[in-house]
Amino acid sequence: MRQLSPRGVTEAISCNRRDFLGVVTGATAAISLFALSSGKSLGSPRKSKRKAVVVTFGGGCRDEETFMPEGQENIPHLLKELIPQSTFFTRVINRGILGHYVATASLATGVYETFDNFAAVPPDHPTVFEYFRRDLKRPLDDAWVVAPANGFNRIGGSNSRLFGPNYAANVILPKRLLKKALSSTSGARYEHLLVDNYETPLLAPEVRGNRIDLHLFSHLMKLSVSDFVAHALTLSSPDELSVYIARQLMRRYAPSLLWITLHDMDVAHSGSYSLYIEGIQRTDRLCAEVWQEIQRQPEYAGNTTLIILPDFGRDSDLDAGGNGFQHHRTGDALSRT
């Protein structure tokens, strides 16, 4: 397969974000990503062979640390392994609210959501999970979300009267599961995996919605709590924990729709540029590992669409009203791209 040069990368196929979301979410999602082979009804209760895995990354990153020449060393897997096999959209702009939960919810609905980013509320508009489950009559175990923080616990389903909880996805909060599994004396060893978010609000949202608790998770995954905790100790970041959970889901249930939100690079809010770069590099590696897992699993290999996209960017170093890479508050071009 032809490898793209850096110049080729920047000249790859481009389209508007909302046009793209119109294809992969909303009323077209079930047909465009999960249409059954010819001769089978879309209303069939049997699982489709077509699958989709969506990886979004929050915290945002800028072109200068990624696709610009000086940043390309941070994303070798995206540039050399994934983009040559894919359609690459060079222009992705978020014109909505620059908060991680509300922005990710907007990706899941295809509509710019306007709720308070730190509120414990579901999206106002139907999500891709609800369209998928209702229109294709998919069971609950065929749509899952692996979310990075407690604030994402309501993302699996919307407030829509015609959709809602009956068609929502299962939501797993890996850090919350790990925290529940730990004793008060062992928590310090896992502190690096338990940071819920890097923009701590005054009031943390209540964990509600269609989320999975620790003992149900252990039962569903056929994985003991002790084994889960022991494996977590071998990991270096919360995103590695999320990808580990995603692998277990793929091997155990092979869901047709799996959504993973990564969040390590949002450590930029701490003001550490080196940790921000490390988060970008780790996200690049984990995206490649997800693709490799797809190729290894017979249920996924050859019939899976992998979609990788950011929620937004980060502030420019030149904007007097911002803090550069540290935040995403100005609404300037870099923070929205």
PLM feature segments, named:
Residues 53-54, 282-326:
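Metal-dependent active-site segment of extracytoplasmic phospho-/sulfohydrolases and closely related
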Residues 114-121, 162-196:
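Acidic, His- and aromatic-enriched active-site or binding-groove loops in soluble protein domains
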